[in-house]
């Protein structure tokens, strides 16, 4: 019988909030409870509001005086304070292992002999110059960001990533030994995924229903998705586009584009609305300009939605080209996106194959049980290694 692992789950965010890290913080905790052992959640921190307020103030001051960006989530001061907070939380308790998702502002200065497994969807080096918020940074923010990342990896018995893109950066940019990295795709953040039958029931109709999910119209490529909608009409395909999670800029409208600015998945009504939208759509379309992973692709796969996505960042870690989706180059415009969509929508066999492959991808690799099983095995490996070294 496998011994239960006592896991300290360390996170700045609230693990009970389904919105934290797009739902990933909550989902990982539940998966580890099912497959690894006893999970004790030690977050969130009690000074997060103060940190956010001070970060916004410093960011505004930096931009006003230097034109540069301050990275509030990469502060040596707050990293030390976070470490002290979690040291107090760990004191007097018995744990076998620390699991720390998105914790490069906790782990660097944490004083503990408990082995750490960290998880992130990117490194600081991968983010710098890739996301707008990580461009034109203050020299002090760059220095702090790289130091925190390096310290986190040094303290991690294993660093888990959802994509080869992120893992390669840890190895290339910070010298992390490859054998101490692991690549496990993250699951779909769905409390009640649809059954296979429900996901595969929808047939191709006369109208191509496109769905875009994202909070940032510009970064998610909303303009390209709208152009694709217009180009589909020129190709003779009746189509609609439903945008969920953000608002287009003022004046950006189309009679066949609907906008749902926000869905609260913490509430049953919100989860039902989200479910209905995915069940009634034909394709997920996300011409993202920058992306570390993309839970939405896993969620789309659960509903049998073939995803059209940009070949950038960590997206290939969740969208396998020709399997559960199609990857288009960053340079592709609305016409190229429309042609790719039209090719699959116009062919019954291709359409149904895409739905089947998407659902299979969810069942085989893009669900939290698959992630939890692999991560639990990794935890047992780490504990066995430490036991053989006499460090436990």
Question: Where are the predicted features?
Answer:
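Aromatic "clamp/platform" in nucleotide-sugar-dependent glycosyltransferases that forms part
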Residues: 289
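Short hydrophobic beta-strand element within catalytic cores of glycosyltransferases
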Residues: 306-310, 319
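A short, well-ordered alpha-helix in the C-terminal region of glycosyltransferases
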Residues: 350-365, 374
